[in-house]
Amino acid sequence: MHHNVFTNTPTIPIDVKDRSVSELMDGMLRTGFQGRKLAESVQAWSNMLKEKDTTVLMGLSGAMVPAGMRRVISYLIRERMIDCLVSTGANLFHDSHEALGRKHYVGSHLANDEKLFEHGVDRIYDVFAVEEEFRNADNLIADFAEEIGEISCSSREFMYLLGKELVRRGAAEDSIVVSAYRHNVPIFVPALSDSSIGIGLTIARRRGLKLEIDQIKDVDEITQIVEKSGHTGVVYVGGGVPKNFIQQTEVIASILGMDVPGHEYAIQYTSDSPHWGGLSGCTFDEAVSWGKVAAQAKKVQVFVDATIALPIVAHALHEKTRGVKRTAPVFSWDGPEGLEIAYNE
C-alpha cells in the first residue's frame, strides 16, 4: 500500500485498563479531536514548567469557583505551576466567601427562579448561593477597605492586602487569594469593579472612603512582568478580560521599545468558537498577527468545558511533576527600577 508524509503516524485506540491520569493523557496523544488536544495541553504545560527562566501567567474567567474549581487553582499556585494570576473579580469574591467558611450549594438549572428569589437564593446555572451571605461578604469587603484607609493602589496590591486579611481571620489554606499571598504570586483583577468586591468598595465609597484602585498601574505592573521575564507562557481558562489583559502586555512592551518575542507557550480551555470574532474564541494563530504570541510558540487551544478540563489536567500535572524542582520566578516590587525578578529553585 502506498504511504506518504501524511500517513506516517497511525492513531492508537484507547485501551481500558488500570493506569494513572497522566498515563491516560499520554495515550490520548495518539487519538483525535478534543481528546488529543486535551492531552497536548498537558504535554505543553509540563514542558513549559521545565523551561528555565520562564514565567507562567494564567487568565481565569467564568464562574470557576462556584463550580468547585478553587482548590485546583490554589494547588496550581502553591506548586508554582502558575506564577501570576489574572482573574475576574467574581472568582476571587467567591473564593474569599468560601475561605471564610461560607458555601455554594448543589442546585439545578431547572429550578423555579422566581421561587429562588423569594427564598433569597441566587442561581449560577446549577449551583445555588445564599444572597444574605453574599451581602454580608460585600459589607465585610467595605469594612476591610475602611481599615486600609485612603490609599491609591493597584489591584495586585489590594489583593495582597486582602490575602493578608483573610489569613488574619483564619481563612482556609486552600483559598486562591490566601495561597497567592503566602507564595508571592501576584493577582491582577483588571475589572475589579465588575464584581461583588467592587460592590463592597462602592459601599465604602458611599460611607466617605476615598480608596482608588489604579487600573493603569495594573497595566504597567503586569507589563513589567513580561518585560523582565526570561520567557513567558500563558494558560487561559475561558477568555474575556483576563485573556486580553495578559495578551496585550506583549504589544505594550513593544510600543515602549522593548524587544519581546511574544508568549512562547500558549494554552487555552474554552467553549467559545473563533468564527464569532470574539476574543474568548480567538485562535493563537490570530494572536501571532498582533505580536502577542510568538510565531514558533507551542500553541494548544482546547474546545472544552473548563470544569471538565481543569481537574483532569491538574491531576496529570501533579503526577508528571512529582519530585521535580522548578526554577520559579521570585517577584520583588520595591526595587530601585520597579519590579525585579529572580529565578530560584
UniProtKB/Swiss-Prot annotation:
Keywords of the record: Hypusine biosynthesis, NAD, Transferase
Active site positions: 292
One GO cellular component, as annotated: cytoplasm
Organism superkingdom: Archaea
TM annotation in the entry: none
Pathway: Protein modification; eIF5A hypusination
Reactions that this protein is recorded to catalyse: [eIF5A protein]-L-lysine + spermidine = [eIF5A protein]-deoxyhypusine + propane-1,3-diamine
Gene Ontology molecular function: any one: deoxyhypusine synthase activity
EC annotation from Swiss-Prot or TrEMBL: 2.5.1.46
Listed cofactors: NAD(+)
InterPro entries assigned: Deoxyhypus_synthase_arc, Deoxyhypusine_synthase, Deoxyhypusine_synthase_sf, DHS-like_NAD/FAD-binding_dom
Record carries keyword Mitochondrion: no
Function: Catalyzes the NAD-dependent oxidative cleavage of spermidine and the subsequent transfer of the butylamine moiety of spermidine to the epsilon-amino group of a specific lysine residue of the eIF-5A precursor protein to form the intermediate deoxyhypusine residue.
Entries under HAMAP family matching the protein: DHS (MF_00153)
Family: Belongs to the deoxyhypusine synthase family.
Name the UniProt record assigns to this protein: Probable deoxyhypusine synthase 2
